[in-house]
Amino acid sequence: MAEELRIMENKSREDTNLSPVSKIEIYSFFDPFSKDCFKLSAILSKLRIEYNKYIKVRHILNPSLKVLTKCQAQSTSDFDNIALAYKAAELQGRIRAERFIHLMQNEIIPKRDIITEDMISDCINNAGIDYQVFKEDLQKDKLTDSLKVDLHIAREMEIEQAPSLVFFSENVHEEGLKVEGLYPYHIYTYIINELMGQPIEKNLPPKLEYYIQKKQLVTMEELLTIYEWPEKLLNKELKKLTLQQKVEKLQYPEGEFWKSKMPQC
């Protein structure tokens, strides 16, 4: 297994003053413009489904100079700076913020679009975030302070690239396990099982239509990751949902997407 991991290091989190909140806590450092980070989000979704009782994932936009410069270059104001927008979204809850960044990545990666205020606005509303509160929060100085905290965490964990995951057990004095880059799904399940030290009963994924309804927009690759069905069978089930007017197929240069026509649950 060690040979399969190109870079896997132990890092302590004692100096970051972070408290464990679950059996296994996973810190996910991402670049919103990275295709590998986009692909990893599907793997993290599957981990959350199967190991829901055993893990908690915390997403942190990698506050490196390279990523923040890219966020600034893609923006015309604070409103469409995705780094600041993500921090403002976090003030209304991490779940909503994660939904927001998922929707944003679905916009900017497959379509290769630049970020606009309209795009931010649509994703904010679709993520269930209060738009007026979001606009007010964007003006607060504490967003910059929050980015500085993320930078401190990234430096303490010696994060040098995105995606990077750092796994921690519930013992705050134990070192974390850092995994840089993108790997097959079984690598991450191996790590979780090793850290737990006991067999884990995995949950089954929800019905296909419920998953798409919750996510609103998903890639074909994500669905193949979540369900592990033969592609022919998955296409057959998606066709059924299309005929039932529950989903619609979208085609972009980066691949095939499926959009829910059902109200968000």
From Swiss-Prot:
Q: Gene Ontology terms, cellular component aspect?
A: cytoplasm
Fetch the InterPro entries from UniProt.
Adapter_SpxH, Thioredoxin-like_sf
Q: Does the keyword Cytoplasm apply?
A: yes
Q: Which Pfam families match?
A: Thioredoxin_5
Q: Which family does the similarity line name?
A: Belongs to the SpxH family.
Q: Under which name does UniProt file this protein?
A: ClpXP adapter protein SpxH
Organism of origin is Staphylococcus epidermidis (strain ATCC 35984 / DSM 28319 / BCRC 17069 / CCUG 31568 / BM 3577 / RP62A)
Give the function comment from the record. Answer: Adapter protein required for efficient degradation of Spx by ClpXP under non-stress conditions. Interaction with Spx stabilizes Spx and exposes the C-terminus of Spx for recognition and proteolysis by ClpXP.
Which UniProt keyword terms apply here?
Cytoplasm
- Where is the protein situated, by its record's location annotation? Cytoplasm
Highest taxon of source: Bacteria
How it assembles, according to the record, is: Interacts with Spx.
